[in-house]
Amino acid sequence: MGLRENDDGWDFKVLILDDEWVLRIPRNEPAAAKLATEAGLLPALAPALPVEIPRFEHASREPPFVVYRLIRGEPLRHDDPDGVRAFLAALHAFDASGIDLPRPDWLEAWRENAARFRDVVLPLLEPGERSRGEALLQEVETLVGFEPRLTHCDLEACHLLVRDGRLAGVIDWAGARIGDPALDYGWLLNDPFPDWDVDDELRRRASLYYRFGPWFAVEYGLRTNQPEWVRSGLENLRSRL
């Protein structure tokens, strides 16, 4: 039996068996709760999307893990902009009203993020950088005025899989929730597709979410005692200030 291990994820350990099956194991109870949410969401969502998403062949509650067939593809770079936009349109149009999903008070949740970043990340910046960091944290108050929709919340290259030049699959739905659809545009508008024609206000909020991304990485590195996450997170944070 061939076995590959991916131990890089924050919430899950992933094993790939015989290049055919994915075994996904949560690292802690909050991650197990996210996995249960995925198990309730993905079967309802799959028919509404133009791409593959994981279809759990087996889901265990104790011990918690899931098994699904590997979705083949390479991380998205600059491929298939029309296909990516079609996926986003379908995702954000999906009616998730009957599904048990996190529905946070968005502004309050981001205020809590900002408070945590102010306590543990801001002090790591150089004195001359802190005023810009604080100004960014205060921008959290502007993350309002949108229609909440189902969001993936972690759309980066490694979760957007391409085959033959087309977006073929989207994985890792652990963060899915009802929230600001601009979050799903954060990396896409600021890396592969900056020339997309989108609403100015959506672009503004997407830029904020993109700039906040490395703050989460630094906080995670501090919380889990992983200095490399802190180092790389601070490097990316500084580049986005």
What are these regions (language model features)?
Residues 1, 72, 80, 93-153, ...:
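An alpha-helical support segment within catalytic cores of ATP-dependent transferases
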Residues 2-106, 122, 145:
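ATP-binding pocket architecture of kinase catalytic cores
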Residues 10, 48-53, 72, 95, ...:
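FAD-dependent flavoprotein oxygenase/oxidase catalytic domain
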Residues 30-32, 146-151, 156-208, 212:
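Active-site Asp-x-Gly
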Residues 32, 119-124, 128, 200, ...:
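ATP/Mg2+ or Mg2+-diphosphate-binding catalytic cores
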Residues 35, 81-84, 133, 211, ...:
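Hydrophobic packing residues in well-ordered alpha-helices of helical domains and bundles
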Residues 43, 189, 219:
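A cross-family signal for key residues in well-ordered alpha-helices
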